[in-house]
Regions:
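Membrane-embedded helix-loop-helix hairpins and adjacent transmembrane boundary segments
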Residues: 1-557
Length: 557
């Protein structure tokens, strides 16, 4: 089957849709504008956000446009199991973070960023490593969302890819700039309600318009045996396992998640994250089925670009009114995450770069707000420039997630184990990144002893991943037991095998190397940290007493 003819809106129609969406979102954000904005309100809504807003914001932030595109690409490439590998593991990682989130919040109820907690635990070195990695991740996330906007506009209108990228960037910045995080979570609520309502209609509409079960049944004749297998090992090793490992790192290393963790009321963390888990999984798996349908209908991605699969399916099988709703759906999803990234970047620059370092214990709230808004402007420009390269979304997701993998164990261990030192944290992250880079870019030939070494390190990483999950939900003994078993199984099965799957090998190597280095250096040290002092060192920026406490804490560190 050849590509169906695209339906395209006129330039005027697309501009009207974008103006209505971003104009309406801007008006909605004015309800939370304050003439004299507070620093804590701008960054985390003073830690008092309720259940409904928090759950919706968490869901909307995790459901970004890349979720739609990535899930569809996965379904198109890997068949029956593709959407499940993307949506299920992504949902599981939202659930995974809440037990650790309870610990982070208990240690530092007034925190603004996770890097700020690391500053109180270790000092500036560890804080800046986490902060810089978060900055890089959020800028790349902006790029991914703006890329999705450009792809959508280019397929559904006469406007260019660059025009779509530019409009999305300016639109998101317009309603986030003044009120920051408070504007982000309020608009998230409206966006997630709209996304869920539209998705429930669009998915079955495409299904029946494409011919329903009869058309898809015929598609079994044109897909491969691996694509027809729900338990395909190719899909597990090339998509499921790498993405599972990557999103685990996202859950810990992404400031947009931490920001909502520190914003929601402390007693509502668990129900908020459970609700977001269910919301994310159901929507993303459903939308990923569009990629599976495209595969079984024999559709070829427009111009060979897999990012075009979802807009291509929508334009081929939906009537104009539904295409307009689909357009709003994707624009809403990318905007809800892009505004979260801007708020996250602002919080990192305000707290971790200025508040805890450049200000030398004497931060000026007005300067912090100005810096936060300037950061949003600069970050938007950077995201727009990077988006112009139109890189593959799924590749970027796996790469950034694996990059953050080196941070996961040192961060979690620092919040539970009093022996972890600043040097152990720093060298663990640097070592993990170095070995990940060697594997991912094949700087050394993955053969013989070299490959065997990395497979052993990756086996340790696999044990760490499953061990941390067990530890979060069932405690230390279960975590250690599951981790050791996971390592043993990994050493047995990975030997001579995992070297063929570079993405997964690199991701697990980052976990394993950072864990080994962190544990060894911590055991060699003699430090025994008192976790009670974290709460004393992490304070609000909104009153004089808190600022005095910040100065005193910084002097201690």
């Amino acid at each position: 089957m050849s590509d169906p003819v695209f339906f395209q809106f006129s330039t005027a129609t697309v501009i009207i849709l974008l103006v209505l969406f971003y104009g309406g979102t801007f008006l909605l954000s004015t309800f939370v504008n304050e003439k004299e904005e507070s620093v804590d309100g701008f960054m985390v809504s003073s830690g008092k956000v309720g259940f409904g807003i928090s759950a919706a914001s968490m869901t909307a932030t995790w459901i970004w446009a890349a979720s739609f595109y990535g899930a569809a690409i996965s379904g198109y490439n890997y068949g029956l199991s593709g959407p499940m590998h993307y949506g299920f593991w992504g949902a599981l990682m939202i659930l995974f973070i809440y037990p650790f989130g309870l610990r982070f919040r208990a240690l530092a109820p007034n925190a603004h960023t996770l890097a700020e907690v690391m500053h109180a635990r270790h000092g500036s070195g560890s804080q800046l490593i986490l902060a810089v990695s978060n900055l890089m991740g959020s800028v790349i996330s902006l790029m991914v969302n703006f890329t999705a906007a450009g792809a959508l506009v280019a397929v559904l209108s006469p406007l260019s890819f660059q025009a779509g990228v530019l409009i999305a960037g300016i639109g998101v910045l317009s309603y986030t700039l003044w009120s920051g995080f408070r504007a982000s979570i309020l608009t998230d609520f409206a966006q997630v309600v709209a996304m869920m309502s539209i998705a429930v209609v669009i998915i079955p509409w495409v299904y029946f318009s494409a011919g329903g079960s009869e058309a898809l049944q015929a598609g079994y004749d044109i897909i491969t045996e691996e694509q027809a297998d729900f338990f395909s090992m190719t899909a597990i090793l090339e998509q499921g396992a790498p993405f599972f490992v990557a999103v685990l790192a996202y859950a810990i290393g992404n400031q947009t998640i931490a920001q909502r963790l520190f914003a929601v009321r402390q007693d509502l963390i668990k129900p908020t994250f459970i609700t977001a888990t269910l919301g994310y999984g159901s929507i993303v798996i459903g939308l990923g089925m569009l990629g599976l349908m495209a595969l079984m209908l024999g559709i070829v991605p427009h111009e060979g670009d897999p990012n075009n699969i979802i807009p291509q399916m929508a334009s081929a099988y939906l009537p104009p009114v539904m295409i307009a709703l689909f357009f709003v759906l994707v624009i809403g999803s990318l905007s809800s995450t892009a505004d979260s990234d801007l708020s996250a970047l602002a919080a990192i620059m305000m707290t971790d770069i200025y508040g805890r370092n450049l200000a030398k214990g004497n931060p000026n709230p007005r300067k912090m707000l100005l810096l936060g808004r300037l950061t949003m402007i600069v970050a938007t420009m950077a995201g727009l420039i990077l988006a112009s390269f139109a890189l593959d979304i799924l590749v970027m997701l796996v790469f950034v997630g694996a990059l953050w993998g080196a941070i996961v164990f040192p961060v979690i261990a620092s919040c539970y184990w009093n022996r972890v030192t600043n040097q152990a944290f720093i060298w663990a992250v640097l070592g993990g990144l170095l070995l990940f880079t060697v594997v991912r870019f094949e700087l050394l030939p993955m053969t013989g002893v070299v490959a065997g070494f990395f497979e052993i390190v990756a086996a340790v990483g696999g044990g760490v991943v499953v061990g941390l999950m067990a530890f979060g939900f069932f405690g230390r003994i279960a975590g250690i037991a599951v981790g050791v078993i996971g390592m043993a199984v990994g050493i047995f099965y990975f030997s001579g095998f995992l070297r063929e799957y570079t993405v997964l090998l690199g991701s697990l190597t980052a976990y394993g190397a950072s864990t080994i280095i962190c544990v060894l250096l911590s055991l060699l040290g003699k430090e025994e940290f008192d976790f009670d002092v974290i709460n004393e060192r992490v304070t609000s920026f909104d009153d004089d007493a808190a600022l005095a406490a910040v100065r005193a804490a910084d002097q201690k560190i």
